[in-house]
């Protein structure tokens, strides 16, 4: 009887040890698999983050070099959506800021520091061009000037107003017409014509909207004024 009891005990212990071994092996395999999945997910997340394109100031397509201001701007869309002007990741004018209006929208920026000097809009359909002309005459040398049309920016423009804008570096201002879309970035005291200007004519054959051309957009890097 004692021999039989001892044999049963040995068998029971052996079964227990075998069961424990099997369970431990299964657990170890699952643990290895879980850790493997965890590391795989971490590597995948890291790869996704590393391949995500970087975001540059104002959402422009590439970073600006040192001593340059990043800017992006868009004209208005028909008479529904106002223009938008962004400089150095700071939205200067937009419909959301509620500081845009029909006509020519203009932002003045210190060409050395990038600080905003003023933002205004002038109604060139139902307004008076005289205040706009006086405003243009007050712009100081070294000032960066950004302009964008909304609805109609040309009807009330006079030759004098166009000349003052041309002196800021604009080429297209002489041909800006009724309901054309136009964006421009120039400066007071500029010695050459500005490379930053886009102009789309109002043409019923090509207009995107009924009575208005498509929105015109522009981005770039403005050289910082040096002493």
From Swiss-Prot:
Subcellular location: Secreted; Cytoplasmic vesicle
SS bonds (residue pairs): 58-86, 64-221
Tissue: Ubiquitously expressed, with highest levels in the retina. Up-regulated in mammary epithelial cells and hepatocytes undergoing epithelial to mesenchymal transition (at protein level).
Domain of life of the organism encoding this protein: Eukaryota
Keyword terms, alphabetized: Cytoplasmic vesicle, Developmental protein, Disulfide bond, Lectin, Oncogene, Secreted, Signal
GO biological process, one term: keratinocyte proliferation
Induction field: By TGF-beta in epithelial cells.
Signal peptide: 1-24
Annotated GO CC locations: cytoplasmic vesicle; extracellular region; Golgi apparatus
GO molecular function: carbohydrate binding; cytokine activity
Signal among keywords: yes
Function recorded in the entry: May be involved in retinal laminar formation. Promotes epithelial to mesenchymal transition.
PANTHER family on file: UNCHARACTERIZED FAM3 (PTHR14592)
Annotated protein name in UniProt: Protein FAM3C
Species of origin: Mus musculus
Protein's gene: Fam3c
């Amino acid at each position: 009887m004692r021999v039989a009891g001892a044999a049963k005990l040995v068998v029971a212990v052996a079964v227990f040890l075998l069961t424990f071994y099997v369970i431990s092996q299964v657990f170890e395999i699952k643990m290895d698999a879980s850790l493997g999945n965890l590391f795989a997910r971490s590597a995948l997340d890291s790869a996704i983050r590393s391949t995500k394109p970087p975001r540059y100031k104002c959402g422009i397509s590439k970073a600006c070099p040192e001593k340059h201001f990043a800017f992006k701007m868009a004209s208005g869309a028909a008479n529904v959506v106002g223009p938008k002007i962004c400089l150095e990741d700071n939205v200067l004018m937009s419909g959301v800021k509620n500081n845009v209006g029909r006509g020519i929208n203009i932002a003045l920026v210190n060409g050395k520091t990038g600080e905003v000097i003023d933002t205004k809009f002038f109604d060139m359909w139902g307004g008076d061009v005289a205040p706009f002309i006086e405003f243009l005459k007050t712009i100081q040398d070294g000032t960066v000037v950004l302009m964008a049309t909304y609805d109609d920016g040309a009807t009330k423009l006079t030759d004098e107003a166009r000349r003052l804008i041309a002196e800021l570096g604009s080429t297209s201002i002489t041909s800006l017409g009724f309901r054309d879309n136009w964006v421009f970035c120039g400066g007071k005291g500029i010695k050459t014509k500005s490379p930053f200007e886009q102009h789309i004519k109002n043409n019923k054959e090509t207009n995107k909207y009924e009575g208005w051309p498509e929105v015109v957009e522009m981005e770039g890097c403005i050289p910082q004024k040096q002493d």
